[in-house]
Structures are given as structure tokens and as C-alpha cells.
Design a protein with these regions (language model features):
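Short alpha-helical segments that sit at the start of domains
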Residues: 1-12, 37
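Short capping segments at the starts of secondary-structure elements
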Residues: 18-23
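A short acidic, leucine-rich amphipathic alpha-helix
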Residues: 26-30
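Short amphipathic alpha-helical interaction segments
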Residues: 32-44
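Glycine-centered, phosphate/nucleic-acid-interacting loop/turn motifs that mediate DNA/RNA or nucleotide
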Residues: 49
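Basic, amphipathic "hinge/linker" alpha-helix immediately C-terminal to the N-terminal HTH DNA-binding motif
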Residues: 53-75
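PLD-like (HKD) phosphodiesterase/transphosphatidyltransferase domain
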Residues: 85-165
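C-terminal regulatory/effector modules of DNA-binding transcriptional regulators
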Residues: 142, 147-263
Length: 263
């Protein structure tokens, strides 16, 4: 890796070759680097086993493909952490698995929504806007905000597909505030499911086909309502779906018969 990291030209060549074999003059046109610099570094890459010559073109070897993929992924992770360093520094990340953290590069380019003195409800308003425009939604709520059951209720009544996971201690409150009849209708109609976990949840997650939002708890144990990470990139949405699915696998479903008896 040191051989690659020490030269931006070599990395640029490998990136250009990710899309398939190229001649040196093709790399020259794409990169605007000097022909001699490209030629010299391409041959060094060949000597190290990262690139091979096929007829008059050059292509990545398996080794080159593996290394440049890892290197670009690592750079995205560093970019993700650096761009929002305070978000990752002073929050509880115990809700994320090692595998989730290994794939933080998926959040590269995310926007950090912050409340400020001019708009102390900025994150909440952004959350509401995203909810209202959703066509389907998967949500993990770690706490009961008075507005969120109302948002869920409206979506259910509009026939929007909603999958909800909450902790057991706020389950009753969510059902009460959404409305027993609406919950029952959503479950019967197949556009609403609600599951619960017996332990505390340390992440707020909302995912649709078009966005993902991530909220975390501060190190003092309180939920940070002033910062929200937002992305509309497919790889970020996929990252969030993986997390949701892992929680969903461990959550207990609301059994309709039991629900009717209790409520």
C-alpha cells in the first residue's frame, strides 16, 4: 500500500483503469497528466503486479483491483469521519456493529443537519419534511417524541408502507398516540408493522427509497435532538437497511390478538 500511497499518479492510473483496459494515450486524455509520467508509473505498476499489459492496452490485475478498491474505500471512511468529526467523536456508537463501522464509507458525502440559535427546531423540521414526502418508510425510534406518532398515523391512513421498531417501554405510548384503530387498520391492510425490543435502543434511524437519516445518543446518555445525519445516496440507504434488518431480526412483532386483548 505504501508504494501506491506515495504517488497520486499511480492511484489516478489505477482509478482510470477501474472502468476497463486503456492505452497510455487514453489515460493521458482522461487525466491530463504528462504522457511520460503516466508511462513511467504504468510500467512501475506492472513491475509490482498491479497492472498488466494486454496487446497495446493496460488493465488492472486482480491484485490491483483489490488494492485500489480497498484504498478508495478507506479514503471515503476518512472523509466521512473527518467531515463530521464531532458527530462521531461525542456520540455513543455502541448501536453500530463492527461491520457497520467498517462500512462507514457508505456515508461519504452525508449532510449534517444542525440546530442553531436561528432555528432551534431545524432537525425536527427536516425530519417532518422527509416523512411527509415518503412513499415507504422503515423507522427505528429510541424515544417517544409527541410529533412522531402523529406523522406515522398520517402515513398509515394514506396507505404508505411503514415498518416501525421501538423499545418496549415506549411501545404502549406509540400505539396510544397513533391510535388503536389506526394501528389495527394498518396491520390488517398490510401497510403497517410495529415491532419492539426489550432493551434500550441507542440509534434513531429512518430509511426510505430516497433518503436515510441517522441520529445518535450523546455520551451522557441523552438523545441528541440537535444533530441529524442525512444522505440520499443509494450506498448510504443500503447501509441503513442492513442496520434496520439486523434490529428487525431481533425484534418481537406486535401480535394482533394480544394487541386487541391488551388495548
Amino acid at each position: 500500500m505504501k508504494f501506491l500511497n506515495n504517488s497520486d499518479i499511480r492511484i489516478r492510473v489505477l482509478v482510470d483503469l477501474l472502468n476497463g483496459p486503456l492505452k497510455i494515450r487514453d489515460i493521458n486524455k482522461k487525466s491530463l497528466l504528462s504522457y511520460s509520467s503516466i508511462s513511467s508509473n504504468v510500467h512501475k505498476l506492472c513491475d509490482e503486479g498491479y497492472v498488466e499489459k494486454i496487446h497495446n492496452s493496460f488493465q488492472l490485475t486482480n491484485l490491483g483491483l483489490i488494492y485500489i478498491t480497498i484504498l478508495l474505500d478507506f479514503r471515503d471512511v476518512i472523509s466521512t469521519i473527518t467531515d463530521n468529526s464531532d458527530f462521531w467523536l461525542d456520540h455513543d456508537i455502541s448501536s453500530l456493529s463492527i461491520d457497520d463501522l467498517n462500512k462507514l464509507s457508505s456515508l461519504e458525502g452525508s449532510e449534517l443537519i444542525r440546530c442553531n440559535s436561528m432555528d432551534i427546531y431545524k432537525t425536527h423540521k427536516e425530519f417532518k419534511r422527509l416523512f411527509k414526502n415518503s412513499r415507504n418508510l422503515k423507522v427505528i425510534f429510541p424515544y417517544l417524541h409527541p410529533e412522531y406518532p402523529k406523522l406515522i398515523r398520517r402515513l398509515i391512513l394514506k396507505g404508505i408502507k411503514v415498518d416501525l421498531i421501538v423499545s418496549r417501554d415506549i411501545l404502549d405510548g406509540f400505539i396510544r398516540d397513533i391510535g388503536k384503530d389506526v394501528v389495527k387498520k394498518g396491520i390488517y391492510d398490510g401497510n403497517f408493522s410495529i415491532k419492539y425490543l426489550s432493551h434500550d435502543i441507542k440509534i434513531a434511524l429512518a430509511i426510505s427509497n430516497e433518503f436515510i437519516t441517522v441520529g445518535l445518543f450523546k455520551l451522557d446518555g441523552t438523545y441528541d435532538q440537535n444533530r441529524l445525519l442525512l444522505s440520499n445516496k443509494k450506498k448510504a440507504i443500503s447501509w441503513g437497511l442492513t442496520i434496520f434488518d439486523s434490529y428487525d431480526d431481533n425484534a418481537l412483532p406486535l401480535i394482533l390478538d394480544w394487541f386487541l386483548d391488551i388495548f
